[in-house]
């Protein structure tokens, strides 16, 4: 309703002057400044006869309210002469539909250029009128409906508004109709509030910006219409209840007459959910069934990666409600057989070759595909590592540390070295990425483990890492350690509390270790501390899935089992080669290397058959530097990407479709070999597909030519048949209708014999002449129809004449015509005594059968 509100604003701001000479029916006259400011737009958009016309322009029941003229500035914005009455608008609507309006179905308003939203608004009003009349059983003031079964009662709805016009085309400017529309809406809003909401009136609100206090313009606007709401002048001030125009116009959707607004309206009053609670002025639709983005964001975490986390603050976090599901989800699928000591203080030992990198993204939305393409790292041969696809967010690199004697050259770690490798952590680090994964129920024997907390504050110079997917590299500890290595420790505490969004998943503990007094403060690696604490607890990353062939039984010897602490490594931004399809892990013997191998593990989709917890965690051996134990030699574990299974299924589907396509092509060529005579004559001869198609085309061309010849021959035969039928019809038309023709001489002879017999009999009795007049038509028909060629023919034609001319339906008109002739040619009606004389004269003078 942007255009409608624009019209309302124009009606509020502009003073009223004399009417324009080009509008002979407008009751609301506009200011010339309004016309100049609006340009030719408002002058050109007029409503012609039949649309929103007014029959009696000056018949308002209430007097028009006029405000004093004066300049209106931005700070003096207020209501200017809004007519609360609806008389003219009702007349307009009733005029437009004063004929036979039988249903509230959709109307296109032909002849009036309206936008689709304007048509919707008007059709809603028509539907509401139907609802008021037939459902609420009240008379609608807008338009009346009539059913075809009402008969004469339907004339009551046909009001003679159009007759009152007497051919005058009232042209009303669009802004006048807009103002009347707003008066109509405000009127209904006040009617809804007046009878039952006197105790529930909204408290007066002071509008923002340049709005004047509602005490000044609400009274001016509504006091003459709704004294119950605003009170009379003589009413005590304490009993007066104020009303905000925002309350009245809150349900008015800004959709009507938007064609008159060229730019954005300066006044945007209605909210987004207009007409939610007003059933009297809105047509029911499917809006409540449409999904809401706000609701979707409340119940879904699909878009959580686009939300930046809050900077972590040092604090003590409460104990999570349950740690068993987290451990179960971490070591699910029963692949890497975890041996977790049940000691209360488990430690994680980081080797000298361990590297920790956290991918940090700049503030901005993150694509969820970044997680789907991220990888976990597990040991593999020194083959080219398969990196995940590059991620748009940049990496947050820290200055590389100085080279340490005894270390192999490796990529510069993003974090400085922290402590000698002899230092052990007091608590295992928490790994709680931002992406949620479903957890499975805890397996028997999984005991809750403590988690670190109370991390030191993060320096302000280090930006907070965004919760993004990051891989994990597991490096074995069974090899010689260098003199120095990055290690860190964290104070004992409680794990982070659940996030405000109400998720209950706890951050999984990635690797417990042996207990030892901490030798290094957690502040030595602030980014890691920030990384481990900033992520939301409810979003637990899916644990790596390893083939069950790599599992080691808990009771097996553990002296030669290398230890794998968890480290983080960012993926290399290089093109990703295709991965093998998912399946059992590919095992290959490894050769000794100076640098420990790394296992690379992708976070695949959770599989129900693989999500099993290996071993009883409570039955694991006691203190020991253990993260994940894998029996040497270290195998290569190759897992596909999360979409590798989908890719493999798609590849199999494509192969099947290709095989089916080729089979259909071969079947089609075999069919062609059987149909084409030139090819079927030599079945043993191998013919190429091109030759087969060529021979088939020639064969089809030959068949088409033969078919054309047959069609031409059939057409010629049809033409001959039509010519013969025409000749037969012509011969039949030349034959007589009665069979054997009778000569005209014979007709005359029979008529002379009939006249002589009538003359003789009339001289004896004059009544026979009357009988001859009645019988002459039958004699003429008998003489023309009966044939005397043979006795058989005489019999047949006589019976046919008897059936055709002597039946009562045929005799009645014949006798009637004879009597009419007797009455007109003789004086039987006027002077019956002269009939014998007239009969004798007729037979002697030869006037038989003719009028006397």
Swiss-Prot record:
InterPro entries: bHLH_dom, HLH_DNA-bd_sf, Max-like/E-box_TFs. Keywords: DNA-binding, Nucleus, Phosphoprotein, Repressor, Transcription, Transcription regulation, Williams-Beuren syndrome. The modification Phosphoserine is found at residues 20, 23, 25, 29, 196, 556, 602, 614, 631. The modification Phosphothreonine is found at residue 27. Residues 649-703 form the bHLH domain. Residues 548-559 have a biased composition (Polar residues). One of its GO terms (cellular component) is cytoplasm. Phosphorylation at Ser-556 by AMPK inactivates the DNA-binding activity. Residues 568-584 have a biased composition (Pro residues). Expressed in liver, heart, kidney, cerebellum and intestinal tissues. It holds the Pfam family HLH. It comes from the Eukaryota. PANTHER family: BASIC HELIX-LOOP-HELIX ZIP TRANSCRIPTION FACTOR (PTHR15741), CARBOHYDRATE-RESPONSIVE ELEMENT-BINDING PROTEIN (PTHR15741:SF14). This is Carbohydrate-responsive element-binding protein. It comes from Homo sapiens (Human). The gene is MLXIPL.
